[in-house]
């Protein structure tokens, strides 16, 4: 069975009170529409058709991809009208309709729904709620068969008492769609063309409407305002937390933990409070992450330790290495096994060999640092001349004294030592000691300046 997916994303979202189109508002670092597209792709359809309207150019710009067909809805005349705009592009056997502001829908739920759809049967996703206010109601006959969907504003009191609501997500035979779209009417309280009216048409045409429900009602929750958006965010984070804990992660507090990307984890991982994981993060076995850390597009090898208040981006921490507290690893930073980066150390495009150490108050940029080398406190690599970047190379077993300025390009060879307070501008040969500072001069009888007395 071939599949086309239509995603409705044309709404303005006035209750968001924002210049940003509603579907571009983020949940967990990705737009709501981005989440829906991600789920759609996992179903491997032959086409994904995104119906856009308000803020169309910005939506297209943010999400443009070769596998997406953007369809313009110039006037927002209802969900049925929106689907009709995509009709000329639909060639598959089945059409699945999704919504750009319903980001938490699970792929497994959609797979169960699609399994119920064929040329003689619609698949309709419904949800049972204690308070279904705002939802269209699922009307069934005495045998429990779905006969129609009545929108909330058009429902009578008896219909409003129904607890089963329409999520709007449905799978239907493409061969019938054009006929049903042509028969839609806007004779209703909203003056719109409701997609839900095809349910009654399908029943009248002798088709069966088979229903499916999500495991969790939050899967089908949309966001019309900032409060609902925050509810989706928190539910997403708790869901991700449960997923990670099921894989062997200890979260000190799942309510104070955020995932904003794709995270893969090993076993016996410990993550403290207020940790944010962004982009693609790989965490291997026995890793420990302290509180208040931000980790983005980073790999943490087995047994690595990230201490409190550290910020890592585009970095790789080797097996048994550690960083922090208050460490910053910028893109291109690599720590080999058992390397150590302490508090208030910043790395950028720097590679620390196995067992190398930079304990505190240090900046290392564009640097290659050999195994077991020790970097003293207050050391900086002077890697930028205002126009170009240059590299600092340190061999194995180098000892850099405190408060050194290493003016790149420069090489300090294996086993060399630099004295505290040195400004190193020339190569230091293997095993040598480099002293590059002014000789101390003591002045006897020195008197400190005195404040000038005001008259």
Curated annotation (Swiss-Prot):
Gene designation per UniProt: glmU
Species classification: Bacteria, Pseudomonadati, Pseudomonadota, Gammaproteobacteria, Pseudomonadales
Positions annotated to bind Mg(2+): 101, 224
Name of this protein: Bifunctional protein GlmU
Gene Ontology molecular function: any one: glucosamine-1-phosphate N-acetyltransferase activity
Function: Catalyzes the last two sequential reactions in the de novo biosynthetic pathway for UDP-N-acetylglucosamine (UDP-GlcNAc). The C-terminal domain catalyzes the transfer of acetyl group from acetyl coenzyme A to glucosamine-1-phosphate (GlcN-1-P) to produce N-acetylglucosamine-1-phosphate (GlcNAc-1-P), which is converted into UDP-GlcNAc by the transfer of uridine 5-monophosphate (from uridine 5-triphosphate), a reaction catalyzed by the N-terminal domain.
Cofactor binding summary note: Binds 1 Mg(2+) ion per subunit.
Known partners and oligomeric status: Homotrimer.
Region (Pyrophosphorylase): 1-226
């Amino acid at each position: 069975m071939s599949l086309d997916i239509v995603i409705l994303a044309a709404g303005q979202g006035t209750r968001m009170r924002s210049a940003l189109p509603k579907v571009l508002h983020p949940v967990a670092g990705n737009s709501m529409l981005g989440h829906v597209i991600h789920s759609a792709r996992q179903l491997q359809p032959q086409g994904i058709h995104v119906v856009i309207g308000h803020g169309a150019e910005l939506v297209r710009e943010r999400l443009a991809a070769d596998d997406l067909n953007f369809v313009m809805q110039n006037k927002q005349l209802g969900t049925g009208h929106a689907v009709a705009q995509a009709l000329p592009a639909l060639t598959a056997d089945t059409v699945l309709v999704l919504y750009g502001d319903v980001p938490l829908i699970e792929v497994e739920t959609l797979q169960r729904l699609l399994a119920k759809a064929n040329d003689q049967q619609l698949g309709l996703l419904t949800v049972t709620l204690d308070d279904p206010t705002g939802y269209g109601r699922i009307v069934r006959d005495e045998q429990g068969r779905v006969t129609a969907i009545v929108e909330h504003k058009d429902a009578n009191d008896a219909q409003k008492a129904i607890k089963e609501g329409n999520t709007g997500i449905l799978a239907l035979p493409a061969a019938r769609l054009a006929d049903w779209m042509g028969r839609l009417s806007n004779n209703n309280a909203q003056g719109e063309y409701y997609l839900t009216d095809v349910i009654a048409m399908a029943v009248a045409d002798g088709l069966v409407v088979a229903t499916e429900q999500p495991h969790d009602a939050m899967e089908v929750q949309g966001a019309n305002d900032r409060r609902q958006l925050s509810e989706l965010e928190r539910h997403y984070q708790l869901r991700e937390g449960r997923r990670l804990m099921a894989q062997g992660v200890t979260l000190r507090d799942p309510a104070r933990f955020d995932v904003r990307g794709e995270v893969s984890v090993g076993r016996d991982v410990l993550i403290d409070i207020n940790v944010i994981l962004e982009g693609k993060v790989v965490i291997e076995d026995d890793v420990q992450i302290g509180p208040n850390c931000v980790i983005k597009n980073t790999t943490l090898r087995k047994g690595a330790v990230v201490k409190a208040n550290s910020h890592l981006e585009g970095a790789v921490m080797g097996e048994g290495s550690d960083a922090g507290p208050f460490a910053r690893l910028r893109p291109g930073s690599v720590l080999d096994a058992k390397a150590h980066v302490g508090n208030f150390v910043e790395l950028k495009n720097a590679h620390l060999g196995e067992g190398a150490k930079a304990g505190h108050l240090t900046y290392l940029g564009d640097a290659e640092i050999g195994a077991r080398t020790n970097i003293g406190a207050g050391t900086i690599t002077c890697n930028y001349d205002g126009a170009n970047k240059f590299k600092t190379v340190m061999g194995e077993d180098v000892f850099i004294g405190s408060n050194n300025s290493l003016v790149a390009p420069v090489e300090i060879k294996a086993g060399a030592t630099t004295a505290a307070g040195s400004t190193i501008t020339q190569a230091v040969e293997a095993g040598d000691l480099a002293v590059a500072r002014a000789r101390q001069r003591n002045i006897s009888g020195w008197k400190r300046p005195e404040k000038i007395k005001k008259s």
